[in-house]
Regions:
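Short, structured "edge-of-domain" segments at secondary-structure transitions
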Residues: 1-180
Length: 180
C-alpha cells in the first residue's frame, strides 16, 4: 500500500526528497500513479494532512482514488515536465505532460502480468535506474529514451533473466557526488 500525505514538513533526508515531495499549491491537481499504469487526478486539498514520522496510520489510497491498486508515484497533473516510468518486466517509457482534463489517464499500454514499479520526473539530464529482485542495477541516460504518447507501450529498458523482475525504478539527477 502506498503512503499518501500532504505536509509542509519535508522528509528528513533531502537526498530522498524527489521520492516524496512534489511542489504544488492547495488549488492544484496531482496524479496518483498506480501499478496498473493509470494516473488518478486528485485535488491537493482532498489529500489528508499529516506529519511524516509522527503519524502511525496513513490514509488508505482506496478511500482517496477508489481503487485497490498500489500507488507507485506522484506527478503534477498540469506540468509540462517529462516523466519516466518503469515496469516489472523491464519496460521503460518517457512521456511529457500536461495530462488531459480527465479523472483517470492511462500512461502506458502494459503487457499481461506486467505492472508499473516506479515513476519520476526525468528530463534529458537525468539517469534512469532499475533495480531487480536479483540485486542487479541498471543506470542509463534518460536522453536515450525518446518520449512517447501516453497510450504507447514503451521500450526495453533492462534485460531480465528467467524468473527475475524489476522491483524498483526511479530517475536520478547525477552530480559529482552521486554514488550508485
Amino acid at each position: 500500500s502506498g503512503k499518501l500525505y500532504r505536509t509542509a514538513t519535508p522528509p528528513m533526508d533531502p537526498a530522498e526528497s524527489h521520492l516524496r515531495i512534489l511542489p504544488t499549491t492547495t488549488r492544484s491537481d496531482v496524479g496518483l500513479v498506480t501499478n496498473d499504469g493509470i494516473a488518478h487526478a486528485v485535488h491537493v486539498s482532498d489529500l489528508p494532512v499529516s506529519t511524516p514520522g509522527l503519524t502511525t496510520q496513513l490514509p488508505d489510497p482506496e478511500s482517496i482514488i477508489g481503487t485497490s491498486q498500489r500507488v507507485v508515484g506522484l506527478i503534477s497533473w498540469r506540468s509540462e515536465a517529462t516523466y519516466a516510468l518503469g515496469t516489472s518486466q523491464g519496460t521503460v517509457k518517457r512521456f511529457t505532460g500536461p495530462l488531459p482534463d480527465k479523472q483517470e489517464v492511462s500512461l502506458i499500454a502494459l503487457k499481461e502480468l506486467d505492472e508499473v514499479v516506479g515513476i519520476a520526473e526525468a528530463g534529458d539530464d537525468s539517469e534512469l535506474t532499475f533495480i531487480t529482485n536479483e540485486a542487479n542495477i541498471l543506470v542509463f541516460p534518460a536522453s536515450s529514451v525518446r518520449p512517447q504518447g501516453r497510450g504507447a507501450a514503451g521500450m526495453a529498458g533492462i534485460k531480465l533473466s528467467d524468473g527475475a523482475k524489476a522491483i524498483y525504478f526511479t530517475s536520478l539527477k547525477v552530480t559529482k557526488d552521486t554514488q550508485v
